[in-house]
UniProtKB/Swiss-Prot annotation:
Domain PpiC: 174-276, 289-388
Enzyme Commission code: 5.2.1.8
Entry keyword NAD: no
Skewed-composition ranges (Low complexity): 439-452
This protein's name: Chaperone SurA
A cellular component term, taken from the record's GO annotations: outer membrane-bounded periplasmic space
Protein's job: Chaperone involved in the correct folding and assembly of outer membrane proteins. Recognizes specific patterns of aromatic residues and the orientation of their side chains, which are found more frequently in integral outer membrane proteins. May act in both early periplasmic and late outer membrane-associated steps of protein maturation.
Cellular compartments annotated: Periplasm
This protein's domain notes: The PPIase activity resides only in the second parvulin domain. The N-terminal region and the C-terminal tail are necessary and sufficient for the chaperone activity of SurA. The PPIase activity is dispensable for SurA to function as a chaperone. The N-terminal region and the C-terminal tail are also required for porin recognition.
Signal peptide limits: 1-25
Domain of life: Bacteria
Pfam families membership: Rotamase (PF00639), Rotamase_3 (PF13616), SurA_N (PF09312)
Spans annotated as Disordered: 329-348, 434-463
Amino acid sequence: MTKPFSVVLASLLAITSTISPLASAQQSQPLDRIAAIVDEDVVLQSELDRAVRNVKSQYAGRENQLPPDDVLQRQVLERLILVKLQVGRADGSGIRVSDEELNRAIASIAQQNGTTVDGLRQKLAADGMGYADFRASVRDEIIVQRLRQSFAQSRISVSEGEVDTALTQQAATGSKYHLAHILIGLPEGATAEQIATGQKKVDGVKTLIDKGELDFPAAAVRYSDSPNALEGGDLGWRSLDEIPNAFAQLIRDMKPGQVAGPLRGPSGFQLLKLMEMRDANAGGEKKMVTEYNARHILVRVGDNQTEAQAKAKIDTIRARIVGGADFQATAKESSEDTNSRGQGGDLGWFPADAFGPDFGKQVEGLADGAVSEPFRTQAGWHIVQRVGSRQTDVSAENQRAQVRETIGRRKLEEEYNRYLQELRGEAYVSYRTGDRADNNATAAPAKSADPALPAPPPAKPTR
């Protein structure tokens, strides 16, 4: 059985502002029209309006950190365009989300918001968002996540040498750094004029920050071309192995509150702020975990097998095993998990959370040799037989795994952002709203909405 890639459904609500079920919205909807044509898809004005309202609701009480409405609308529209392009690319790659998967995702979102699916429907209706539109938005976000996963699996690798180097760095400095950044984007193959314009803009933004006319998060919201601009450019806590080598030494020498840059990177000019730093927990302590050895049999649900058919099949298989049939032989004959079927369903040794919480709970609750009742996961219907358990020191193994994951995450962020730039640069985009309205296809401009720095805001925002 392949280990499921963790898709935290709560994070779907933060990827784009279009699907937040708890954001305020006007109940009356204007007559819908097209805001932008994106290849063979469109962004509707209602989508754009709803997304802008949701961003504003997230900044309630901090409205002075938002850019003017026309700039905010352009930023949000560009984000929606990127979502449309990713969904289109995923569709061309055969990435799909079934209705059943979508239903489970929405049920999880409802649960995380302390309600039922029916309650979520009512909340959406009160907020002026149709349930069909909400389903479409959630489907798009799952598709985007799967495209990103596919990209990572095909293009991102981390060598043992990279892990060794990072561990050496960690031994020298175990510090963690809370970072924020502002990106003034440049297109690939930027001309001298584009570079000069970008340099002028980033210098102007830095001046506003240095003079205290804008704090860093507000400047990021107003001027950054990064996908996390609307989050104030916050990059979260990172260790040195999660930071590009070109910036790692610089950040190590900074003090909290300092802003570095402008720095020229592959995507454009950057300003970096060290928000906070802290020492990581000292290593050396053993970490003991319980590992389990188990076998399983999987019956999938899909186009060729309904939920009821799959459940009936797994019930029959379990009855045979309880009646005396050998589990391994039955797994080789009947399991639909191609990865473990040849080994009689053997999954080897693994911690309880390796295959997801539902699977782990079943294994933890069994005695050695016992066979579970049929249970459902995203993969389908299972039965599992626990073979044994043991205590294992995984401190060193975990440390290497964590370092490998952080390096991979950093590489993915860099490469996927470049991929999005390429995707945007190749796209047919025609704006039909605001001061960018046109009737012709446009090549992607530099991601920045403004060619030069606008005038500073009239009032200094609250820090």
